[in-house]
Amino acid sequence: MEVVVRFFAALEAGDIGTLREIYAPDAVIWHNDDLVEQPVEENLNVLRGLHRTVSGLRYDIVRRVPAPDGVLQQHVLRGRLPGGAEVELHAAMYLRVRDGRITRIEEYLDSGKRATIKAAREAASGKR
């Protein structure tokens, strides 16, 4: 459970170095809206972009429950988009942990809210 607490503290702080240390080198991150297994470095790039796009990023934990091989968590990601709009993304995650490192994340989230954040990130970076 401690590694999951550290993981979310690093996410909120935008501490990519700590996130890299917490992930096992061969960890994969899966999202329900694209069904793709991301490798660690690709996920860290997404998280960098999230931090550049959403200010005041925080995770309000609804529940965190130990599982035999990890943790199940429900949370609400909150923050502010570049135009000033508040964002609120409800999600549930399964985080598999082995030897004190995260080896797999399965994240279930509202794809519409995720698309709003992605569009804001792309607009801020000049991509379409």
Model-inferred region functions:
Residues 1-7, 30-34, 49-52, 74, ...:
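Short, mixed-charge, low-aromatic patches
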Residues 1-25, 119-128:
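Short, low-complexity N-terminal intrinsically disordered segments enriched in polar/charged residues
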Residues 3-10, 17-20, 35, 88, ...:
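Generic alpha-helical hydrophobic packing signal
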Residues 16-20, 24-68:
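A solvent-exposed, acidic/Ser-Thr-rich amphipathic alpha-helical stretch
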Residues 45-128:
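A beta-strand edge to alpha-helix "cap/lid" segment located at domain peripheries
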